[in-house]
Amino acid sequence: QKGFEHDHENPLTSDVILIDECSMINSYVYHAIVSAIKEGAKLIMCGDNRQLPPIGYGNIFGDLLLKTDSLHISHLTKVLRQAEKSGILSDANKIREGIMPIEQPELRIVNGELQDMTYMFRDTREGLRNIAIKSYLKAIEQDGMDEVAIIVPRKENCDNSTLEINIKLSDILLNKNGRTMKIGKKEYLVGSKVMQVDNNYEKNVFNGEVGYITKIEEVQNGKEKTLEFTVEFKMSDQTKVITYTRNELDQLDLAYAMTIHKSQGSGYKTVIIIIDMTHYTLLDTCLLYTAITRAKKRCLLLAEPQAFLQCIRTSHNKRNTWMMLEENVESLAS
């Protein structure tokens, strides 16, 4: 690991540090943050403790919210991502508490005054995938590709993984007459929507950034010819153009579909979610709540009935952590 620019020997100069999406912070990252804050500075942490817990050890944000006697804790009450009459908002809040948002699974259910939360239940995984792909193609015509996402629990090695869906959408969307690059089953072409999956400090591009391949060309590298490709990343206030070599292709992944973990912290006008029993070990209220709240305007939940019920009935959010050891010991002693 490269480490961090700031630490206890070279602290941040800011008097107030504000961190968003704190439910994603694991123990290692939190330790690095507090080590880099100068004495006397204030730390403000914002987040939703009912979303997915962080990748890695610990449940820092959830644990800190239990320390009501020593920390100042405020609860935000106004939702800005969805409208007040949104079915996305009302159903997400029910799911957050493990409450069924519908009477029973049916072929098609639309909830909310805005009719923005749609459920479609099928018994076959292929049927779910076909609806997702058809719905995606229709949605990008309305909202544009940057504002539409298919999100699923798992990356690969199962039905309806991001790998499977990305390959199918790439085959539909892109012209394969030009140069292509391939890693395993994934094929990259000019126009491919891609996500950076590792931090690359030298290129100043980071995990989770999404862009499009704009050029693939053959270049002379000494006595050998190799392929280079260019990706354009559009941020809210800037555009980054990054060139990669063929050997750096594993830093990218196709990004028409992504895992729910990867989508955390992002929002899209239209979100299409697929839940089936191949993902059964991951299915719980946190996963489904996180997925639904990625949607700003429209959410389509495609599910096997049993998988949906498993999400509502199951909660995996609680972790046994060292931060709460003192409280647990005191509770047992009393």
What kind of region is each of these model predictions?
Residues I17, I44-M45, I150, I273:
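Hydrophobic positions in the central parallel beta-sheet of the AAA+
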